[in-house]
Amino acid sequence: MKFEKGITIEVSCNIEELLKILKENDFELKEVYDIKDIYMIDKKYKNIEDKLELLKHTILIRDIIEENKETKQITYKYKEYDENGNITKQGKTNCKINSIEEAVNLFNALGYEKLININDHLLVYANKDDEFVIECVNNKHIY
């Protein structure tokens, strides 16, 4: 499993204001892509009320749509949290697949069910020192 470091925050301004701030700080657009995630959960865990604990038991069936290619994969995200719900360790592992529908059918047969669909539009900006990934989630939230 590949472990990662990162910070996720919800942005309080609109996308236009955020892009203006990035441009003023010499950030340039490097990449644009979309991710369509289907979160699947083992039925025995579906009634967990703690959202962070619930997400520990999910598998993502993911369609990544870039300008010149499309990648379909199963993703498992591993996260550890502190007592305040902050991520202290995270990683993920991926397995490429040929069909989103066949993957959903396989997990249904294994006792999983669809929990939620999340559609992300991602913009990657970078300058000489830093890189930011702007994630527009379901056309409502910006991270």
Regions found by a protein language model. Give the residues of each.
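Charged, well-structured binding/catalytic surfaces in domain cores that contact anionic ligands
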Residues: D130-N138
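Beta-strand-connecting loop/turn residues
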Residues: H121, N139-K140
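N-terminal strand-loop-strand beta-hairpin
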Residues: M1-D129
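Glycine-rich, acidic/polar active-site loops that bind/position phosphate-bearing ligands
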Residues: Y143
